């Protein structure tokens, strides 16, 4: 993989930041890199709330918020439900178009909070719908795939 280190850091940290801000406390995020044919694939999987069907086509559009900004609980970066300007995923999409790599995602919205106005309590142990951590880890989340050509 030949790419400017700062750019690669911005790409990965942008997806990680979104994963952290959408995964309740006591949750889990996984990241792995592997060679797949002629590509290097970086996968970032969060076990968070997932993205609603309505928002799936909009998240790379730029300055898009998945909920009303008044509903953000902390407004502090890297905390659950912090919210943001919606610039990270736009930046990653622009980088992908200019630097010849692909970005895609799969997501499952937590069935207990199906709309953007339904709120996750922010801590798995505070959720009234599940019995334990594993119950949360199997209900929702998103996986982002970054595919970089090897040179």
Each language-model region and where it sits:
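Conserved micro-motifs of the catalytic ATP-binding
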Residues: 3
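A residue-level detector for a conserved hydrophobic packing site
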Residues: 8-9
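Short helix-loop "hinge" at the ATP-lid/N-box region of the Bergerat-fold HATPase_c
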Residues: 18-20
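Short beta-strand/loop element within the Bergerat-fold HATPase_c
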Residues: 26-38
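Acidic ATP/Mg2+-coordinating residue in the GHKL
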Residues: 46
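Short conserved segment of the HATPase_c
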Residues: 51-76
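Glycine-rich phosphate-binding loop
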Residues: 72-94
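Conserved glycine-/histidine-rich ATP-lid loop and adjacent helix of the Bergerat-fold HATPase_c
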Residues: 91-104
């Amino acid at each position: 993989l030949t790419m400017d280190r700062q750019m690669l850091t911005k790409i990965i940290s942008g997806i990680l930041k979104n994963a952290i801000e959408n995964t309740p406390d006591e949750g889990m995020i996984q990241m792995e890199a592997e060679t797949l044919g002629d590509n290097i694939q970086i996968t970032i999987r969060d076990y968070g709330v997932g993205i609603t069907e309505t928002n799936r086509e909009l998240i790379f559009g730029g300055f898009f918020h998945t909920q009303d900004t008044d509903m953000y609980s902390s407004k502090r970066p890297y905390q659950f439900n912090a919210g943001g300007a919606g610039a990270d995923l736009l930046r990653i999409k622009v980088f992908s178009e200019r630097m010849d790599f692909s970005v895609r995602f799969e997501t499952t919205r937590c069935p207990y909070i199906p709309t953007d106005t339904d709120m996750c309590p922010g801590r798995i142990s505070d959720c009234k719908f599940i019995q334990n951590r594993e119950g949360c880890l199997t209900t929702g989340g998103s996986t982002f795939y970054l595919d970089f050509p090897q040179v």
